[in-house]
Amino acid sequence: MACTSNLSSLSKSWAVLDVPRGAPKATGLWLKRQFIFKTSRICMCMPTPTATQPIATPLIRDNESLLKYLRQPSVLPHEVDDSRKELLGRTRRQLRSTSEPLKAMNLIDTLQRLGLAYHFEDDMNAILSQLSSSGQSDGDLLTTALRFRLLRHNGHKIVQKFMDKNGKFKDSLKEDTMGLLSLYEASHLAANGEDILLEAMELTEAHLKQSLPSLPTQLARKVSSALELPRHRRMARLEARRYIQEYSEEIGHDPNLLELAKLDYNKVQSLHQMELTEISRWWKQLGLVDKLTFARDRPLECFLWTVGILPEPKYSNCRIELAKTIAILLVIDDIFDTHGTIDELVLFTNAIRRWDLEAMEGLPEYMRICYMALYNTTNEICYKILKENGWSVLPYLKATWIDMIEGFMLEASWYNNGQEPNMEEYVANGVTTAGAYMAMVHLFFLIGQGVTEENVKLLMKPYPKLFSCSGRILRLWDDLGTAKEEQERGDLASSIQLFMRENNITCDEEGRKRILQLIDNLWKDLNWELVSRDAMPLAIIKAAFNMARSSQVVYQHEEESYFSSVDNYVESLFFTPIIN
């Protein structure tokens, strides 16, 4: 289905809305799925609020409050959009007229970081294709590493030399902080087997940490930010918000480009508010949480993740439909996690396997309501895809839901029978119950680019490695972000505890360190999927990467509560515009 949006008719609004922070706390099965939006200890890598970047506190969690807020948009002034279009034209001319490779690469890099690259995809691809076909770069370390990172990030097959003729990194590189930083960022796109890049990662990290205390303030800030979270692992829209502030402080920045980035950010924010309005109205009409009062009422947080996975404005419809599936998934997760008896869960699982309305007859009333919501929503998505592209996709979407419900049921049976899975069993099943496969299969058809008979066959079990790598990163980061709170509640057996038991590790810090190493290895596997580009369209590859990025950004730290973290992201992305 073509996922497009009409930006010219959008509006923007912002306000402060104070809503109580209460939210249900998950208890029940000791094998917590904790999908995406459960209470957990995580925090966000957000820019520090400034005078030009006011941060309010919306605390909008329940759908009724969100709907009330979204009824008060103000119209985006036409003169603002006219100015944005003029700046877009000026930037396009600048990009096309830049003949020097380094200047072109720096401009592309800046456009990507400012969240503007989607406007110039054709022009940028032409430049990158020319760079790719021109062979090895003879420039300095900064230029060479930048070229490699841009080409690989955009799906070009590229092997780059970073060594001298003796196969060693030059000692002189240690004094080139910007070059080391560029190489450090590039090294995070390394795949398994690319030993030179992996060695470069260790070398540059060590030298950057060593030099950090003596660096000028602005450069030290850049280095600290990269060491905390490399750019390859950041959420695009959040990086745009952060980098707009950083770019404004850079000496010699392009004021026209900065102005364009601010206007465009606010424009996309207006689009997100319109999308939220549609999702919130749908959720209210669905009425699930009115009947299932134990279930989570968080369409806003569901939408936050879709923006992380699909940041480009053209995927507006995709975000809306994916947010619907996530919202229903959370309700089903709560049924398995906090409410359903084992006998009821068996009935529900069998009904999902049948996938017909008669299957509801033996279910409790609350399960019938949820079953009907899932059945109708999935069929409606299938109808939209059929109408748009002529594809009959119900067998594929239905199969992913069945797989996920069976995964929930497996966890319930482990608990009910007093069984403990091994690490691999837990993680493999946890990818399914985290919704990773469900989300990626839905997106494959919703995006609708590059769909072939060959790659459609890959959407059934066993799922593509692209999906499983991204899903495993999600699963492990989820456990890292929630483990301490789960222990405080008396929950058991996350991947961390299972790994520690299997490897005779008694120190929690060491266990977490080893899980982080597993995640790093999964990123190398994921990077290989970008290098190999077998059968999957680039848009789906990028979505899988973005799912992994979103999970790392969300669950990376433990100092803040989950809701505090989500509040920061939601406020920044959806409700607070960038003002001059």
UniProtKB/Swiss-Prot annotation:
Q: Which domain of life is it from?
A: Eukaryota
Q: Where is this motif: DDXXD motif?
A: 333-337
Predominant cellular place of this UniProt entry's protein? plastid
Compartments it resides in = Plastid, Chloroplast
Q: Which UniProt keywords apply?
A: Chloroplast, Magnesium, Metal-binding, Plastid, Transit peptide
- Binding note for cofactor: Binds 3 Mg(2+) or Mn(2+) ions per subunit.
UniProt note on tissues of expression: Confined to flowers.
Q: Which residues bind Mg(2+) 1?
A: 333, 337
Q: Name the residues that bind Mg(2+) 3.
A: 478, 482, 486
What cofactors does the UniProt entry give for this protein? Mg(2+); Mn(2+)
Please list the residues that make up the transit peptide in this record: 1-44
Q: Which residues bind Mg(2+) 2?
A: 333, 337
Tell me any Pfam family this protein matches: Terpene_synth
Q: Which GO terms describe its biological process?
A: diterpenoid biosynthetic process
The UniProt family comment states: Belongs to the terpene synthase family. Tpsg subfamily.
Subunit text:
Monomer.
Its job: Monoterpene synthase (mono-TPS) involved in the biosynthesis of monoterpenes natural products, constituent of coffee beverage aroma.
* Record comment regarding domains: The Asp-Asp-Xaa-Xaa-Asp/Glu (DDXXD/E) motif is important for the catalytic activity, presumably through binding to Mg(2+).
| Name listed for the protein in its UniProt record | Putative monoterpene synthase 8
Organism the protein comes from: Coffea arabica
